Amino acid sequence: MNLHIPVFLIIIIWLCGCAETTITENPSICELKGKALGTTWSVKVLTATDFSLEDLRTDITQKLEECDKIFSHWRPDAELYQFNGALTTTPISIHPQLLTLLKHSKWIHKQSGGTFDPTIAPIVNLWGFGPVGKTRSTIPTDKQIGEALSLTGMNKVELLRKGLVRKKLPALQLDFSGSAKGEIIDQICTLLQGWNFNNFLVEIGGEVRAHGKGRNGKGWVCLLYTSPSPRDGLLS
């Protein structure tokens, strides 16, 4: 049997093949931005695949909201906020993600010789930068600093079995500002990989993670802005 294919059909197939090749070789950057976690976020995806930008935004914002309700020490309904507010030495059951971050923080604390210390929350509050801090017009006294320091120490938070954590001091508080954003960025990256993206850049509050080779195949390039100097009149 002879198979006759119209010439116009061959041309259409050829054009479609060319179009697909062109798109693959010249992927575009799709960018989403927003505010969450008390800061700004940005996601850049380099892809040649058609997808719903709004559906991706919805997934990202839902993930950010989910993480904020776990790691925030500002919002009353957050797991961390409630842990900090529990003035007790009775073992407390905490969210698995919060427990994982606490375990990792203990490891970093050990590796850094105690320099990284999430129990620094009382000091942060004393200087007016925490959720219960007050705007200060004077420097805290040595006595105030000493009292706040007495409430710190990773040795004062104990990991127990079955996801339980015990404070050895009821007033002990945790501040994961130095690590939570990195954990959340990792979760956003996992989300993007679930969308089958393999070339993207995620930034939350100045913390960045890149995946893939970027637009030119040499990796993503991030620029660092120079901080203002006193002579600019921006610092006192």
What residue ranges belong to the model's regions?
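Mature catalytic core of soluble alpha/beta enzymes
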Residues: 2-227
